[in-house]
Structure formats: structure tokens, C-alpha cells
Amino acid sequence: MSDLRAQVPAHIEGNPRLGTWVGVRDGVVEVHVGKVELGQGIVTALAQIAADALALPLSGIRMVAAHTTHGPDEGLTAGSLSVLQAGPALRHVGAVVRALAGPSEEGYVARIAALDPDTDLTTAATAGPAAAVSVGRSEARLDLPDKVLGRPRYLADLRPEGMLHGRVLRPPSVGARLVEPDEAWKAPGVELVRDGSFLGVVGEREVDVDRALDQLRRDCRWDERDLLPDEDDLPAWLRTGPHEEIPVLDEGAPDVSWTTRTLTASYSKPFLAHASIAPSAGLAQWTEEGLRVWSHSQGIHPLRDAIAQALGLDPATVEVEHVENAGCYGHNAADDAAFDAVLLARAVPGRPVLARWTRPDELTWGPLSSAMTATVSAGLAGGRISGWSYDVWSQGHTSRPGFRGAPGLLAGAHLAAPVPLPDRKNT
């Protein structure tokens, strides 16, 4: 055995309890991770690492989806960092388990089951490196059989007992405020949910909900203002509007006395939709015991905290479980759809509510990749670069829940008492 205390991975420091990572159920070792499956195969890769670290075959472990109550907080699944961040943590967990449970011989799983779940992984002794058996092999993806065979697996496939369908009617434009209808509006088979300019319907049958939403759209009257920039001249809007200056590197003006030629060019890109292959969805159930949420969020712990902040709840009463949906390359509307489901479920306590976005919802109200404009200039002298500058104008490139202290959930801006934003100073 060896003491690797000085080499404890960061994700172990933040989640030091053994039972947060590993347990045994029905004779199978369960491995909990905070990283989530977005279609990139990451859970299979982490399963390979975990199996080897525990000295078990891949078939001898069961991967458990990320869960705010029963699993580690590993932040966001983003930036191609999952193996880099979660892999060392799983290896450390396995090394502790092997040190405590002994050789992987007869009775090994039973000995793992008998381990103290409160064992501190940051101070426990560790076994030496495990043999690579699964890692390095092309193992079959754990998530693909259900997807290939069309078996229910995605969030939109969930049908818990008593579930209601829900839809949300978005304002026709940014900043629009709802004038009509009032809470007396009715349609067959549905219940109206209104909080300020947040407007939705819930019902037993999806067809009734969709019909009611169409009727509601026709009956609504909004107070609108033109708040969007000229899409044909985004570069000018970006360069002239209020902004923060963030110097990345500033070594002063270059010496141009020996520069013989200067090249300058500007480049721009518009706002871009992430455009997942299917729209986002969320499922929530509001009960006396607390709030349960099922989401395909890339960060279930930040989502839990954002929901609690937006509604004034104790985060300990909010439980978020990851369920796969359409994958994404960039921040899609998973978090916003989950919050929609929460607001709808709040109106019908005890009943689970599935809130599904439409394609128009996703393309008009989902998070967008920021527009950018840049100017690059380079001085040349004697065939060498004598000076170089690069200036970029853009909005921030993250608006995920909890960033800079704001819940960052779309419907929060539409409530009768909008969620306050933290103070920001323009420079």
C-alpha cells in the first residue's frame, strides 16, 4: 500500500466520502459519477477506468447517472474535460477500495459492501496502480443498445405515474410583457399556469395541451418593445455598446519604426444556435417533502442551486437527477426546460409534469453562441512579424446557471417578481 494523500485529485477533495462514489446493490458494485452522458460516450470511458481501478470486469459494475443527492458534484460536463477530471478521481476511489477490501477474489464484492461509506478518501491508504484490462480496449458503448433498438431511454420517454404534460407560451419578443388573458382563461382538458409573463398549460393528454397552447397564443395580447440590435450590423452594435475591457495581454504599443508593412483585417460572426437534434425537455414534481427534477443539464448541481435561488428554496430540498436527451455541442436549453417544468409542477403539487420545448422554442429562446467581431493587425519587417494586436468585441461565452451569482434561467425573467440580477458595472 502507498499513501497518496499529496496526490489526491481535485474531485476527491470536493467529494471526500467513499459512499458518494461507490456502493453495492443486488450484488453489483455501483459507481456514481458527476459527469453526464451527452452522446459522447463518456460514461462508457469512465466505466472502463472505474472497472480497472476496482479490479473488476466491466460487466461487474453498474454506472449510476449523476444525481445531486446520491453522487459527487463534478461541476459541468463541458470542454472535453471529463476524462481528465473524473478519471483520476475514479482511479483514486478504486485504489482506496482495493486497499480496504483486499484482493479481488471470492467475497470481494461482499467486502466492498461492508466498507464504511463515510470513509474519508483524502486520508485513507491506497493500493498501488491497478492493471489495465478494460482501458485501452474498444469496449461496446453502454448507452447504445437502447438507442439503436429504440427502447425508452431519453427524458422525453419518461412516464411516471400521474404525469401531466406541460407547455409554455413564450413572449413574442425579448422584454414583452403579458397583458391578456388573465387567470380566468379556460380551455378543455387543461389548467392555465400564469406568473407575471410566464404562461403555460398543463393537462392529462398531450393533444389537449398542444391545442390549448395554440388557442392561448391567439388569445394573448402583449406589450412589446424593440430591444434587439440590428441583425444586419451586429459588428457596429458590438463595438459601440457598453462593455467591459478585459486585457488578456498588453505589452504596450509595438515599436513600428522598423516596420515596412502593416496588414489589418476585421472578421465577424453572428449569433449561432446550438441546434440540438431534438428540442429540450424537463420533468419535475413538487411535493411537501421537496422538489424533484429530471434534466439533461450539463451541470445538475449548479442547476439545483439556481432553481433554489430563483424560488427562495433550501437547496437541500431540491433533488436533480440527470436523464439523457438529445446531445449538444454548447449550452442548450436543458436548464431552462427544467425550470419550466418546475414552475408548471408548482401549480399542480404532487403531479409530475413533463415540459417539452418545440423546435421554434429552441431556435428562438434557447441559449445562443455569442456574436463576435475582431480586428487583427500585424506589422512586417524583413519578412518577420514586428508587431501584432488582436482585439475582440463579444458578449460573454457562458450564461449557465449560477454564473456570476445569477440563476440564469430563462423563465426567471418572465415572473411577476423577476429574479434580481447581481450588480454589474459597465466600463
Where are these regions (language model features)?
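Structural alpha/beta core scaffold segments of enzyme domains
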Residues: 1-427
